[in-house]
């Protein structure tokens, strides 16, 4: 087992806010490209994450950077670190 002194790196991903209807929570769509095992074609895959937005600062369409945290609820274990770009609205 590893030492407790080693700092564990937290995963950080970028995605687009698709919903901000919940209080202090946003839904972030994270897209990635995966290579098909047999044919080699790159395919888009996406994941929706619930992230904590303490200030309710995010709007739909914003590109945000989120990082992993300890679970805050059943589905929410990400936190908005920064808003990379604002939506045009």
Swiss-Prot record:
The keyword Cell membrane does not apply. Pfam families: Ribosomal_S17. One of its GO terms (molecular function) is rRNA binding. GO terms for cellular component: cytosolic small ribosomal subunit. The keyword RNA-binding applies. HAMAP family: Ribosomal_uS17_B (MF_01345_B). Belongs to the universal ribosomal protein uS17 family. This is Small ribosomal subunit protein uS17. It comes from Xanthomonas oryzae pv. oryzae (strain KACC10331 / KXO85).
């Amino acid at each position: 087992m590893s030492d407790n002194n080693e700092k564990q790196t937290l995963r950080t991903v970028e995605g687009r806010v698709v919903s901000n209807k919940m209080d202090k929570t946003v839904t972030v769509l994270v897209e990635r490209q995966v290579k098909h095992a047999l044919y080699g074609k790159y395919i888009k895959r996406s994941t929706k994450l619930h992230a904590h937005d303490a200030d309710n600062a995010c709007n739909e369409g914003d590109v945000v950077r989120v990082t992993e945290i300890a679970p805050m609820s059943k589905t929410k274990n990400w936190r908005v670190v920064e808003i990379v770009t604002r939506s045009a609205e």
